[in-house]
Amino acid sequence: MTTVTEVVEGAATPDPSPPPAAADTAPEFVRTVDRRLVHRAAVNEVFVTDLRRDGDGFLAGAQLPLSHGYFGDHPRRPAAFDFLLLLESARQACTAAGHLYYGVSRDTVFLVNGFSVRITDQGALTAGTRPGELVLAGGAVRDEGKGGRLRGVRFDVTLSLAGRRAARIGIDTSTAAGEDYRKLRFLQRRSTPPVTEDLDTTAAGRPADAAAVGRRNPLNVVLGEPVREGGAVSAPVEPRWENRSLFDHSYDHVPAMVLVEAARQLAHLAGVPVTAPVTACTARFTRFVELDSSVTATARAARPGAGSPTPPCGLLVEFRQNGAVVAETELDFGPAAGEEGA
């Protein structure tokens, strides 16, 4: 099995609600789905409001909040829904669909091998005066081994807002039963991994400046002070474990979403304006990022010969821990707010 970065705790408790209806009508946005279906501990961190079968695929709805302590903590004006909010909504919809439609048992954990995000209409993400009503049309392919044993699921989702196709997201996962996952982690480390809820919430070092990484709330800063050498910028990944949007439940590793946030923040430290939106993101996770060992992110121009990081541009961010590459993320940015069409 591929070693990966993110694991979301399985929801072994049966869902008391009946299976969602078929997609003969548009998804509804009146209540959230059972939080256990999307592997969230807090109801207020659930964005999916509806999930229906749609032929061989599925159709979901998600309500995007106008204000959120993490996803809404950005200086871009006019305000826009963040690409990581779209990714989290897609993750939740795919997780629930996996359990309901694609044979993933409730005691199974998803391990994210990689994902891709492409924003196809940046204007569609501009926030209005009401919460966004995101429609997610998705499909999935099961990866099976001998005897039909499930090894993983690959999801592909198209996301639309107000009738405009806004983004396309692909998520590649492996799967493991809960006990198999615990055995895997022990064998890899030769020890039981620590968990986030037991970690000291005191900052490991001096954090990066919040404004410099596009944040107002210091709790949302996930990097330490940067180091610049040649054409590269590096910084330690040091998230705040008490941030309940990033760590909704207890983890035994640094989750993928935190690494992608670290990559974006490092891009801003490398010179990308904090009001420049992410237009595309691809990520690959090759190892678990352990909690009890330092990890460093390094940003370089994604394409040889690229000049200063002035959007539109691309940056490659590499994560290293104990001398090995554990993850890679490539981010593309569009023009900063106020520079569109310039």
Region spans (language model):
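Non-catalytic linker/capping segments at the edges of enzyme domains
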Residues: 1-78, 174-246, 342
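HotDog/MaoC-like acyl-thioester-processing domains
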Residues: 2-25, 135-203, 302-342
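Hot-dog-fold acyl-thioester-processing enzymes
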Residues: 3, 55-109, 233-269
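Acidic/His-leaning functional-site neighborhoods
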Residues: 218-287, 291-296, 316
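A general secondary-structure signal for short beta-strands and their flanking turns/coil
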Residues: 55-57, 129-133, 150-154, 166, ...
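Extended intrinsically disordered, low-complexity coil regions enriched in Ser, Thr, Gly, Ala
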Residues: 81, 85, 95, 99-111, ...
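Hydrophobic beta-strand-centered segment that forms part of the acyl-chain substrate-binding groove
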Residues: 96-140, 264-302
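A structural detector for beta-sheet-dominated domains
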Residues: 63-65, 118-120, 137, 174, ...
